[in-house]
């Protein structure tokens, strides 16, 4: 008669080994099924080629979204500035009002162009909502790889600029390998330049 203590289960005395085996199998099965259900609920990780393709499509979508936002900004700016009355005798900082209104219209188009990528990223994320967490996790891991392998900015000079510091041109595994080679070549060039002095 052995006292057995398990989490949530206390049996003081077992009368037969059959009861012990039954309890042991029950606890083992509960543990097995619970871990299997956890494994099944966990989503599959994105592989690197898929992540890099999604990253490229996001970048293209952000750039293309800048076009309608720039046109919208230009349209709103022209609707506001170019419909106002202009007094030809009034000047601000030596410029007549019509010139300032044209500058304001162009600036509102530029503001629309600058807002385009952030709006495009939000829309793209909503379109790929099912993979948003996986993409965010891969993005963090990708950034850690970049930080670990890229050149320190102290080595930069005008004659030897750092190649693709933020990894914006990496859209495939071959691009990533090329980026790594460029970083190593940059370090070698910087080393030879400093050692020859």
UniProtKB/Swiss-Prot annotation:
Cysteine disulfide links: none
Assembly mode: Component of the PAM complex, at least composed of mtHsp70 (ssc1), mge1, tim44, pam16, pam17 and pam18.
Extent of the transit peptide: 1-33
Membrane topology designation: Multi-pass membrane protein
Family: Belongs to the PAM17 family.
GO biological process terms, semicolon-separated: protein import into mitochondrial matrix
Gene it is expressed from: pam17
Lineage of source species: Eukaryota, Fungi, Dikarya, Ascomycota, Taphrinomycotina
Residues in the Mitochondrial intermembrane compartment per record: 84-96
Protein name listed in UniProt: Presequence translocated-associated motor subunit pam17, mitochondrial
Xref: InterPro entries: Pam17
GO cellular component terms, A-Z: mitochondrion; PAM complex, Tim23 associated import motor
Biological role stated in the UniProt entry: Component of the PAM complex, a complex required for the translocation of transit peptide-containing proteins from the inner membrane into the mitochondrial matrix in an ATP-dependent manner.
Pfam families from the UniProt entry: Pam17
Gene source species: Schizosaccharomyces pombe (strain 972 / ATCC 24843)
Keyword Heme assigned: no
């Amino acid at each position: 008669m052995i006292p057995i203590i398990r989490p949530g289960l206390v049996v003081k005395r077992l009368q037969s080994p059959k009861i012990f085996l039954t309890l042991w199998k029950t606890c083992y099965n509960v543990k097995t099924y619970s871990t299997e259900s956890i494994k099944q609920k966990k989503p599959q990780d994105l592989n690197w080629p898929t992540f890099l393709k999604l990253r490229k499509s996001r970048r293209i979508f952000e750039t293309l979204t800048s076009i309608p936002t720039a046109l919208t900004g230009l349209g709103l700016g022209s609707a506001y500035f170019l419909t106002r009355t202009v007094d030809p005798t009034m000047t601000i900082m030596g410029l007549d009002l019509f010139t300032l209104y044209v500058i304001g219209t162009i600036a509102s188009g530029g503001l629309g162009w600058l807002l385009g990528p952030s709006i495009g990223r939000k829309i793209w994320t909503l379109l790929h909502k099912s993979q948003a967490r996986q993409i965010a996790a891969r993005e963090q891991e990708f950034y850690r790889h970049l930080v670990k392998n890229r050149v320190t900015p102290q080595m930069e000079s005008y004659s030897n600029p750092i190649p693709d510091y933020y990894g914006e041109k990496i859209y495939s595994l071959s691009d990533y390998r090329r980026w790594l080679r460029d970083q190593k070549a940059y370090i070698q060039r910087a080393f030879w330049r400093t050692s020859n002095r």
